[in-house]
């Protein structure tokens, strides 16, 4: 296996449970990338893509406004343009409805899937059942999102829309901050994503799994099979090979014969360490498109979309925006210090992850491209990949996620 984020670790544990001997190879070790720095939400209702109608007309204004959560490293634009044209093609109602149908299958039982994955590993303690809130500054802002909430309702998501006096019962920490709060039921969170995945990986090793920290250089092929992964620490042979490399999947996917428009969508977080008060539940602040999550000993604010590739250094502007938003939302909270982080979301042009077998090779499977819902969908994706390898029939329509049939 290549890649030790949530998808890779989940796949490895489920394969181990099915009786396979597994090697997990990652250049930095478990949970060293996006799986560490995400917002920690198990968001079964995250079935609306970024590419919604109106995105094309709104984007230029957002890029020119440093208070909006969209950023671009302009030197990267020539390389980005081919992907961007394909990506923006999907900013239409038909695709949003198709995306919601596909992702509802993958995400609806995310909390149960994580609990099943963590059972008996010692990682159970990191999983919490929580409501997930969406906060709107104005009723007009909420009404602009009405289509998304109607679509969630259509897919049987349970939520309450609160206004007026009802807002006082949600969380005192947000009193006066919002005119509308939507309370999503049947959600959850991981209170420390990095430690959660490391604990899962520790269980994997304790049960005779092997984790190898190495850079993957290529692979060895014989006929229609990959028989070994070439790394800077030697060649590792295998009967089956699975790639779950997240944002580092783009170049590799081409070598696997896949035609996937693919980019890294850069995201940021800051953390308020040892805050004097804690929110009860995580909340998406709609105006700034960032998520506030109470975690072990800190409040994490995660969000922002920046296109700039995998190699560029972190930008100051997204971090400063998150700090500004934190100061506005939590003006009365004291904390010891602030930490900062940059990560990469693996993004396909149609925003759907790729899950399944690769036609070019008889023994290769992939699982990547979850964009904003990698943690939410990662446990189930790993289970699906393990079931496919073991020739079981997953209880999901996988045609939406076919890596060979990208349209």
Residues of each region from the PLM?
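N-terminal Rossmann-like FAD-binding beta1-loop-alpha1 element of flavoenzymes
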Residues: 1-24
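Glycine-rich FAD pyrophosphate-binding loop
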Residues: 17-37
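Active-site substrate-recognition segment that forms the wall
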Residues: 18, 40-41, 46-90, 218-226, ...
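C-terminal catalytic lobe of FAD-dependent flavoproteins
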Residues: 159, 287, 328-407
């Amino acid at each position: 296996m290549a890649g030790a984020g949530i998808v890779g670790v989940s796949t490895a544990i489920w394969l181990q449970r099915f009786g396979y001997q597994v090697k997990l190879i990652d250049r930095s070790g478990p949970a060293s990338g996006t799986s560490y720095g995400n917002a920690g939400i198990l968001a079964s209702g995250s079935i609306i893509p970024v590419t919604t109608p109106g995105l094309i007309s709104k984007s230029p204004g957002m890029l020119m406004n440093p208070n909006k959560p969209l950023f671009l490293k302009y030197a990267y634009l020539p390389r980005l343009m081919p992907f961007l044209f394909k990506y923006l093609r999907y900013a239409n109602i038909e695709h949003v409805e198709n995306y919601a149908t596909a992702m509802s299958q993958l995400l609806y039982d995310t909390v149960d899937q994580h609990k099943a994955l963590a059972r008996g590993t010692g990682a159970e303690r990191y999983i919490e059942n929580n409501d997930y809130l969406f906060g709107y500054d104005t009723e007009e802002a909420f009404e602009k999102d009405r289509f998304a909430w109607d679509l969630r309702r259509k897919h049987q998501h349970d939520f309450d829309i609160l206004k007026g006096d009802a807002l006082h019962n949600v969380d005192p920490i947000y009193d006066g901050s919002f005119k509308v709060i939507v309370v999503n039921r049947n959600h959850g969170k991981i209170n420390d994503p990095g430690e959660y995945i490391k604990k899962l990986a520790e269980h994997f090793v304790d049960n005779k799994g092997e984790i190898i920290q190495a850079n993957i250089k290529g692979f060895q092929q014989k006929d229609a099979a990959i028989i070994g992964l070439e790394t800077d620490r030697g060649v590792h042979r295998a009967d089956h090979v699975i790639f779950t490399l997240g944002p580092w999947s783009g170049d590799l996917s081409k070598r696997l014969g896949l035609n996937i428009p693919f980019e890294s969508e850069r995201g940021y977080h800051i953390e308020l360490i040892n805050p004097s008060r804690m929110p009860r539940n995580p909340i998406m602040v709609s105006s700034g498109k960032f998520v506030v999550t109470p975690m072990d000993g800190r409040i994490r604010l995660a969000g922002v979309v920046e296109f700039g590739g995998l190699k560029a250094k972190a930008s100051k502007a997204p971090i400063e925006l998150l700090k500004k938003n934190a100061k506005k939302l939590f003006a009365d909270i004291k904390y010891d210090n602030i930490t900062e982080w940059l990560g990469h979301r693996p993004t396909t042009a149609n925003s759907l992850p790729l899950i399944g077998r690769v036609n070019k090779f008889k023994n290769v499977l992939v699982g990547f491209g979850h964009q904003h819902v990698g943690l939410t969908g990662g446990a189930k994706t790993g289970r699906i990949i393990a079931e496919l390898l073991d020739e079981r029939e997953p209880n999901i329509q996988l045609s939406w996620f076919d890596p060979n049939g990208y349209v």
